[in-house]
From Swiss-Prot:
PROSITE patterns: RIBOSOMAL_L17. The keyword NADP does not apply. The keyword Transferase does not apply. Keywords: Ribonucleoprotein, Ribosomal protein. Belongs to the bacterial ribosomal protein bL17 family. One of its GO terms (cellular component) is cytosolic large ribosomal subunit. One of its GO terms (biological process) is translation. The gene is rplQ. It comes from the Bacteria. This is Large ribosomal subunit protein bL17.
Length: 123
């Protein structure tokens, strides 16, 4: 039995967990803010921070590496042109988690994940 993994399994199989995280990260970059349970958002935060760090250097290699995880061209372009330029001087801590309290139905800890700074308005 493997113990002390470097991530939370979220009570899902690996393919389901990967699909969940991929969809949540894409929604996060699309809306710049998402609300969910605290444990899910901790995992989303880890992925989002890694992707933003990778997107700070706009090369063909980095675009191809991120396109493995983000399949939507518009979201990928938004990440490279609007979100990552804001964080060029920052070496980490691109997101903020605001705790909301417990959910009524099952008392799960809820939170909001958002970007620390607002993305650029490129028109």
């Amino acid at each position: 039995m493997k113990t002390k993994l470097g991530f939370n399994r979220l009570s899902r199989k690996s393919s389901h967990r990967r699909a969940l995280l991929k969809n949540m990260v894409i929604s996060f970059f699309k809306h710049e803010k998402i609300s969910s349970t605290k444990t899910k958002l901790f995992e989303v935060k880890r992925f989002a921070e890694r992707l933003i760090t990778r997107a700070k250097v706009d090369t063909v290699h980095n675009r191809r590496e991120l396109s493995k995880f983000i399949h939507d061209k518009h979201i990928l372009n938004k990440l490279f042109t609007k979100i990552s330029p804001v964080f060029r001087q920052r070496s980490g801590g691109y997101t903020r988690m605001i705790k909301l309290g417990k959910r009524y139905g099952d008392a799960a800890e809820m939170a909001i994940l958002e970007l620390v700074e607002k993305p650029l308005k490129v028109e």
